[in-house]
Amino acid sequence: MKKKTNIIIFLLAIILTLPAFAQDTLSHEKVLPTGIFVSYGQGWYAVKDQYISKEQYSGMMPYYNLEWLRFRNKKGYRLQFEYRKSTDISNHNITTDAQQVSFSQDFIFAAGDFPVGSKNVYAFLGPSVQIFYYELYYNFAQPGNYITPTTLGFLGSLGINANLIYPLNKKLNLEGFLRSNVLSITGKKIDDERYRDDQTPAFVSVISASKIDFHLSVRYFLAKNVALSVAYKFDLSRINKWDPYIAASNSALITVQVKL
């Protein structure tokens, strides 16, 4: 009887220690993709700037991205350059040439992990600095004339960024990313007579001006230092202090990552 009891206790001890052996042995430094990233995408873009027109203009717009990410000892940073331009943004028979440029620096810190199913989700959080600039050229045709009024604006922002990474296995990651401004200095083309006492640029909160970037991606590691990802990206930019401006896009992206 005593021998049988000892066997039962031994088996229970093995069962109770199995979760410890099955625990995720990954770390934040191992799961966060680093190196150089080059992206290309296409998506639907819509814009309205009431300095020129209250109508919405929309169409397909390409997306180009170049970034570099470094992460060691639970902290790091990302440098990112994004560019978009299209001459096919329109409203009925009126076309608009649209251009967007942004430069971002994200500071990244490990922010813990939590279990989802049999794996852990790894969280990253930190402050961000971003500069965003846009231009719109409207092509208004009139008898005997071809008028091209322009409008432009910018946002220089302090904000936050957050990453969630869910490693499904050694080859495949699910990843989510969000960046949002909190406090900004912003300016745009305005009617000087109408806004004589409220000139540009101005310091504003996220209530009056927004710049939000969000994407979900699946990353597949082709080799130890090379990965390929496909992603959905949502982008929103808004300046509401003067004649309102708002632009949004939904894009599909493909990215090549090379770890240095």
Model feature map: region roles:
Residues 22-78, 86-88, 257-259:
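Short glycine/proline- and aromatic-enriched beta-strand/turn motifs that initiate or cap beta-hairpins
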Residues 34, 56-64, 75, 95-103, ...:
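Residues that define the transmembrane beta-barrel architecture of outer-membrane proteins
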Residues 36-44, 79-87, 125-133, 176-182, ...:
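Transmembrane beta-barrel strands of outer-membrane/channel proteins
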Residues 47-56, 86-97, 143-150, 200-204, ...:
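Extracellular loop and loop/strand-boundary signature of outer-membrane beta-barrel proteins
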Residues 136-225, 236, 260:
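Outer-membrane beta-barrel transmembrane domain signature
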